Every structure is written in C-alpha cells, then in structure tokens.
A protein has these predicted regions:
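Glycine-rich phosphate-binding loop of ATP-dependent small-molecule kinases
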Residues: 1-285
Length: 285
C-alpha cells in the first residue's frame, strides 16, 4: 500500500538543494545497488499502474530543470517496465505559428490524462517561465502574466480530479559543465547537444533567477514543487520514484491466480503444414 504524503512544498525546506548545494555530498551510487532498488520500485510502479487503470485515476507528472539535469533518464527509469497504454510521455516541440496565436496553455490541454492514464510531461507549460523567458522567446510581461495565471490553471486541473505532481531536477554548475562536455566528446551523446544548450549554459544566473521567481509564484498547496538534487542521477531517479509512489494514494489490486491453459500443438510439417518464412535474418551473434 502506498504511504500517503502531505502536499507540503519542498521548495523552502530544500532551498539549498535547489541551488545545487548539499551539506555533505554522498558518494555516487553503485550500479548493483541502483539496479536492485530500481527493480523493487518497478514492481511498485506496476502495482500503481494497475490501480490507476482499475480506479480510473488521472495522474499528471511534470518534470522541469536545467539542461542535463536528468529529466529524460528519470522518465525512462519510471516508464521502462510499465504499459505505454497507461503511461504516456509528452515532449512537445516548439510551438507552431498557429499555436503561438492561441492561449498559451492551450496546446498542452489535449494531452492531459483521461481516466486510467498517467501523463508525464518532459518539460511543460513552465517553458514560459524558464527557457522562453531567459532566451527572449517571450516578453517579461508575458512571463509574469503566465506566472499569475498558473496557480488558477493548476487549481482547475486538481479540481477536475487530476493528481498533479511537479518535479524540479537541479544540477550543480560543475556537474552540468561535465555532462555537456561529455556530449561534445562522446559520439553516442552528440545528438543531445544543441545550440540552445550552449546558449543556455552561458546564462546560469538568469536561469537561477527565473527558477526562483517560478517557485515563488507557482508553489501552491494544491500543486507544490518538489526539488530533486540530481548530480547523482541514480539517487535522484530512485528518490523521485519513491516520492511519487508515496504521494499517489494507490491501493494494490488483488492478483488473480493465473495458470497457463492446456495447448494442442500439432505437427504442422508436410504438404499441408504452415509454410516456412520467406527468409531468416543473419545470425552473427
């Protein structure tokens, strides 16, 4: 059974973590320990999934954070053992000209969860308070107006029965630099590096101010922000999964006893048997 968690914000109590500081940094988690804990948590996520499906719950999880903070890896860790019919990931591209003419949050609304769904936003409507504001894609007035409206918008979501969780993954300046350098040097990661990443990297303080203003304006009792320090990606993933399982008030669904039925396998070789496949793939391994 999930432990119910109050919706008290972690922004004030973990303010030093939001700035990439820890009193006593812990050693990075070893792979063996990480895989053991993740396997256990995957079982709990599947149990939560079955409750969501059976109860018709609607869950929306928002992930925000600086570039390289680990949003994508965290989302992958959450979703790799659950059904894509229940868990859906939404990562919207830059708005089209038509979308730019609409109410700002309008393009996100069609992706909100229906009954029995968990929707995960890999960046969200908070782009307006972060990257759009810092990089000049919106005016200060537009950003401030968004921050004024966001609490009411999210209150409407919660009042409609959506369980809304908002996570900010905070990476330190040194760790962000290390991760960006690895993207430059590693041919497997070079696709992750964009011109926007480099421009954003140079504006650390501007992003910090935008983050703090976002927290101040949109950290509410009904939709609080939760901060996860993510210099150690493995610990961050486990901490986030553990937390969301504690906040979502799911109840395990009793399992039915299942056994494989008897199966009649006939010899299908011969002139009336099944035709062989047209070709096999090579087997170099």
């Amino acid at each position: 059974m999930a432990k119910k968690h109050d919706q008290k914000s972690h922004v004030d109590t973990a303010d030093h973590e939001a700035r990439g500081l820890e009193d006593e940094p812990r050693p990075r988690m070893k792979n063996k320990e990480y895989e053991h804990e993740l396997r256990r948590l995957h079982g709990e996520l599947v149990a939560m999934q079955e409750w969501v499906r059976a109860s018709g719950a609607k869950v929306c999880i928002v992930f925000e954070g600086r570039d390289t903070a680990g949003k994508g890896g965290t989302i992958k860790a959450i979703t790799e053992r659950v059904s894509p019919r229940v868990f859906r990931i939404v990562a919207l591209p830059a708005p089209t000209e038509r979308e730019k003419s609409q109410m700002y949050v309008q393009r996100y609304i069609p992706h909100f969860p229906a009954a029995g769904e968990v929707i995960i936003f890999d960046r969200s409507w908070y782009n307006r308070a972060g990257v759009e504001r810092v990089m000049g894609f919106c005016t200060d007035h537009e950003a401030q107006r968004f921050l004024e409206l966001a609490p009411a918008f999210e209150k409407a979501m919660v009042d409609a029965g959506i369980v809304l969780l908002k996570y900010w993954l905070e990476v330190s300046a040194d760790e962000q630099a290390r991760r960006l350098e690895s993207r430059i040097d590693d041919p497997r990661k070079v696709w992750k590096l964009s011109d926007m990443d480099l421009k954003s990297y140079a504006r650390w303080d501007e992003y910090s101010r935008a983050r703090d203003e976002m927290f101040a304006a949109s950290d509410t009792p009904w939709a609080p922000w939760y901060v996860a320090h993510s210099d150690d990606k493995k610990r961050a993933r486990l901490n986030i999964i553990t937390h969301l399982l504690s906040v979502i008030p799911f109840e395990p669904i009793p399992k039915k006893d299942v056994a494989l039925p008897k199966r009649d396998i006939k010899d299908v070789s011969g002139p009336h048997g099944a035709a062989p496949p047209p070709r096999d793939i090579p087997t170099p391994f």
